[in-house]
Amino acid sequence: MSTPSALGSFLHAFFEDHLVCQKGLQPATIRSYSDAIRLFLLFTAADKRCKLTQLDVSDMTSHRVLRFLDHLEKERGNTVASRNQRLAALRCFFEYLANRLPVMLAEAHRVTGVPVKLAPPPRTRYLERDEVEAVFQHLPKKTPWALRDRTLLLFLYNTGARAQEVADLKVGNLDLGDKPRVRLHGKGDKWRVCPLWKPCAQ
């Protein structure tokens, strides 16, 4: 059907053009897709007992995808969420192949038909208010970074922001006027506004 070099060409175009230029995915999502497909290729090469460079487009089958997903959970100990993320990446790649190689349409149809697994939501663990107050009471007060550390913890407690959202925060995102608030840049290139408590704004 093709040659090993053809698979390499499709992979290069998938990551360099399709995901970036056509789908406009974020770098973190592209890295996740890359990791998923890398693991799938390694699994396929081991299954065929061949080198990665010897893999062919015809080796990309729905049967292997199903076995790969089973391998992720049973042998690699991946969570259901991780398994579903890997499946999303493979669905996207198989759809891409089918759009360029009609002979892959049936395989792509079977892969996109693989259902995601449902998992019970993880139990959310949190601190009660008195526990949070105890944390603040025990923060060092005389270190060079005491004010910074206290402000960061209070900001996180106030907003529920992720660590990366705080790291990406810019002065222009803060409004410390009569109604203090902050604009946070979250996952999926989405923005949200969060009010700030007066102690936090001060």
Stretch-by-stretch model annotation:
Residues 1-202:
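Conserved catalytic core of the tyrosine transesterase superfamily
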